[in-house]
A protein has these predicted regions:
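A common structural junction motif
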Residues: 97-98
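Beta-hairpin "wing" of winged helix-turn-helix
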Residues: 65-74, 81
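N-terminal helix-turn-helix DNA-binding core of bacterial DNA-binding proteins
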Residues: 8, 14-52, 78-85
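Short, Lys/Arg-enriched N-terminal segment that forms or immediately precedes the first helix
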Residues: 1-7
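Residue-level signal for well-ordered alpha-helical positions
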Residues: 93-94
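Alpha-helical residues within the helix-turn-helix
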Residues: 47, 58, 64-65
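Short, charged/polar, Gly/Pro-enriched secondary-structure boundary elements
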Residues: 86-90
């Protein structure tokens, strides 16, 4: 776990909002045709953000590099999910380390 990469990822409000959406995908992405258990399609995240695809892709890449989300390619689509184990480890370390 790279603490600095996680702090960098969390420093941006859009990336924090994406993590909130991915925490409850049923509430934010109910229109997705694929099962949400697979994650949320990058295109759905693009649409909700209201930003260019390249900007959202860069935000998702930062979250992925920090280990906060996982990605899975299915055909032409990429699905993203929160990595709850990494998030828990980060929160535990933050809580106990400061």
């Amino acid at each position: 776990m790279d603490i600095d990469a996680i702090h960098k990822a969390l420093a941006n409000p859009v990336r924090r909002e994406i993590l909130v959406w991915l925490k409850e995908p049923e509430a934010y992405f109910s229109e997705q045709e694929f099962p949400l258990a697979s994650g949320v399609c990058a295109g759905q995240i693009d649409a909700r953000c209201g930003m260019s695809q390249s900007t959202v892709s860069a935000h998702l890449a930062t979250l992925h590099k920090a280990g906060l989300v996982t990605s899975k390619r299915v055909g032409q689509w990429i699905f993203f999910k929160r990595d709850e184990a990494v998030i828990k480890e980060f929160l535990d370390q933050l809580r106990n380390g400061l």
